[in-house]
Amino acid sequence: YRQTMKTVVEPQLAALHEELSMPLSDGGSLHAELYEQPTATRAVVILHGYTESGEKFREMTWYFLQSGFNVYAIDHRGHGKSARQFKETYLTHVDHFTDYVQDLEAFMQRIVLPRTQTLPVCLYAHSMGGAVGGMMLQRHPEMFARAVLTAPMIAPSSAPFPQFVGAAIASVMCALGKSKELAFIGKPFDPASETFESSFSTSHARFDYYEQKRIHNAHLQNSAPTYGWVKEAIGVTKVLLDKEK
């Protein structure tokens, strides 16, 4: 797997790769990676999951390119190379979950739609990205021709506590002014404690390949939420299950 990624996938991606930073209205910028080919017949926007980055989906990007897509991937704010509020890159924070959705709206309007023109645009969103994508579809049901949400974060876990307990703890801590502090369920990035066996991965080779990138790149080391992120993430459930939306 590693050899194929290094000798086939990565070189082909590099030939089409374009990076850009889209300024955000509240400061900082959103990092995006674009892959465009003249023979494309459609386009796809990739939204990664919690503590991930667009970098994790490079293999998936290659498959999409092979299938005739142009690919547009972002790092959500507080992830990857996008704007952060802290120097500690293991912390994952957002003031309002809707910030993710507004970032995506801006990315679509300013970058994707002008570039894709008449191409049908699809959405591929994973985990937390699935929650962002779901809220985007509520706001703009006509924007995407197709949408695939893999393991969407509709009811995030606050283990070891029941969700209502996790929500209560996070709300109290936020009320006490600790919204940007490390939450009780998280810990700093530690490669020694991140093993294939404790992960949700089903491929040891893929886990090792991305984990090595994380070890050597601080911007890929998100591993823990703040109380503010926990509070906002748990609040997503009510929004996504609202039948009126």
Residue ranges of each PLM-predicted region?
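Active-site glycine-rich loops that stabilize anionic/oxyanionic intermediates
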Residues: 41, 49-52
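Alpha/beta-hydrolase active-site loop
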Residues: 92-113
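Alpha/beta-hydrolase fold nucleophile elbow
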Residues: 115-127
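Conserved serine/cysteine hydrolase catalytic core
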Residues: 222-245
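An N-terminal hydrophobic leader/cap segment in hydrolases
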Residues: 1-23, 28-36
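Alpha/beta-hydrolase-fold enzymes
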Residues: 133-221
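Glycine-rich nucleophile elbow surrounding the catalytic serine of serine-hydrolase chemistry
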Residues: 125-135
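Conserved alpha/beta-hydrolase
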Residues: 54, 63-87
